[in-house]
Amino acid sequence: MAVLIMVALVVAVMLGLVIGPVSIAATRILGDAFSHLGIGHSTLTSTQSSIVWQLRAPRMVLGLLAGSMLAVAGGTYQGVFRNPLADPYLLGVAAGAGLGATLAIVDVANAATVPTWTPLLAFVGAMLAVTLTWVIGGRSMRSTAATLVLAGVAVSALFTSAQTFLQQRSSVQSIANVYIWLLGSLANASWHSVLVVIPYVVVCALVCVLAGRALDVMSVGDDEARSLGLSVRSVRLVVVVASSLGTAAVVSVVGLIGFVGIIVPHIVRLLVGTSYRRILPLSVLFGAAFLVLADTVARTVMAPSELPLGVVTAVIGAPVFVVILSVRRMGHS
């Protein structure tokens, strides 16, 4: 199964580089890549080379990073909270990032500085929301997963109401810009944004994957896990910090992209079973492939215009999620 997912990932990467308003053959792209290593000669024009390496490649890499982080964070949350409906935005990341981005677009930045301020304040807002959630619902030694989730719901409601207030006092153009950001997109991807996000994703995703064994133990219940010698609160803190930090970094750059973190772990679970030691690493690969394919659809189905990436993931994700729930219901009946 891991091999099949790897093949799907390679296919997604090639499609992301090949398909677009200007189609470029995969063999020519590979030839150009080898020519940069001093092997052979490129058959691409300078314009085609720029399209591939300055536009499509950073977009594809950012899609790989975002998809892998959202998927593994969703799987981790589903494990640590023992909630199959958990996603990476459970503890207020989406609401906090939305408030930060709205503040940047409406009040702080001008047209020239929006690309700088929006991801910065979105990241700060996301981490502030998660921190507040933990302070309210997670710092007590007696705190449970349910307490933390309820705190996340309350914090999300607070931040969302503040975001709505900001939007009500802003211009029509600012509201439109906020709306575009909230739907998510890789259109502004660059090598700079890739370099900003990659350390967060690599470290945080690795922590989540390594927590798989502990999540398997916690799946039997907190009390049982403690009786087996596991520090449940410490594991929960580390996992929540890693998942939230990685998600905040991704969301600050690409906006809010739904369904990746909830459906990918479910699909992987159907394929490989219920052990998080297998679910989490495969979710990294599957999530990366899924988001790159979704972005390819988003930028080509209405070319030269683009669909918001969040719309594409919702159109794909909602029916898939219904099918998954039906399969699980049939399995339990």
Locate the predicted segments by residue.
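Alpha-helical transmembrane segments in inner-membrane proteins
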Residues: 1-333
